[in-house]
From Swiss-Prot:
One of its GO terms (cellular component) is cytoplasm. Keywords: Acyltransferase, Cytoplasm, Transferase. Its EC number is 2.3.2.6. HAMAP family: Leu_Phe_trans. It comes from Vibrio cholerae serotype O1 (strain ATCC 39541 / Classical Ogawa 395 / O395). GO terms for molecular function: leucyl-tRNA--protein transferase activity. It catalyses: N-terminal L-lysyl-[protein] + L-leucyl-tRNA(Leu) = N-terminal L-leucyl-L-lysyl-[protein] + tRNA(Leu) + H(+); N-terminal L-arginyl-[protein] + L-leucyl-tRNA(Leu) = N-terminal L-leucyl-L-arginyl-[protein] + tRNA(Leu) + H(+); L-phenylalanyl-tRNA(Phe) + an N-terminal L-alpha-aminoacyl-[protein] = an N-terminal L-phenylalanyl-L-alpha-aminoacyl-[protein] + tRNA(Phe). The gene is aat. GO terms for biological process: protein catabolic process. Belongs to the L/F-transferase family. The keyword Ion transport does not apply. The lineage of its organism: Bacteria, Pseudomonadati, Pseudomonadota, Gammaproteobacteria, Vibrionales. This is Leucyl/phenylalanyl-tRNA--protein transferase. Its main location: cytoplasm. Functions in the N-end rule pathway of protein degradation where it conjugates Leu, Phe and, less efficiently, Met from aminoacyl-tRNAs to the N-termini of proteins containing an N-terminal arginine or lysine.
Amino acid sequence: MTIYLTELSPETLTFPSPFTALDDPNGLLAFGGDLRPERIWAAYQQGIFPWYGPEDPILWWSPSPRAVFDPTRFQPAKSVKKFQRKHQYRVSVNHATSQVIEQCALTRPADQRWLNDSMRHAYGELAKQGRCHSVEVWQGEQLVGGLYGISVGQLFCGESMFSLATNASKIALWYFCDHFSRHQGQLIDCQVMNPHLQSLGATTLSREQFIQSLLSFKEKQVLSGCFETQWLATPTSPCAFED
């Protein structure tokens, strides 16, 4: 089967409409261009993100349905709450963004590492611009879990998460949802639904619903301090928002 895709020009940051994305493979929109931070930022502003395998050109996607979390309604499993009360992982924001991005790459098999050197560099540059943020989970002084993504107003576009210890990524998501919602964050984009996200309570929006939400939230700002470097949990206050 022949498919026709737009090739992005390296000279401009223009993308085709997300509504022209293919149904099969779901959401494939364009190829080419580059990974300049400006291009990636322009993509997220339109509900588009890069993802490609080791042997692929740069591919750009806008799938439907879209996996999302409503941070105001997120509820961790009781077992995760009990685990955190016992083990008291520390949780932070923007303490080790480059390390989180690196671990998100390294914890996957080599043939599945879409977070190549170019992608890691691009998100690192976006972090320097204050657009890419991370949540870290620590066991003592060791980084054992976390997530990172791009903030677009009151929408957070989650890119990847990792876990090197029991429940670490679940705790990262739990604390971030609470923190983000307290700062007027409205929606967390998880891109494509999978069994793990579904087990954590993710739901889906159609492309039309997601783009409508994006347009509504991207011009509204979260409260000041949301993405300042800070601690969300320490051994003296590991569960500040118990039932």
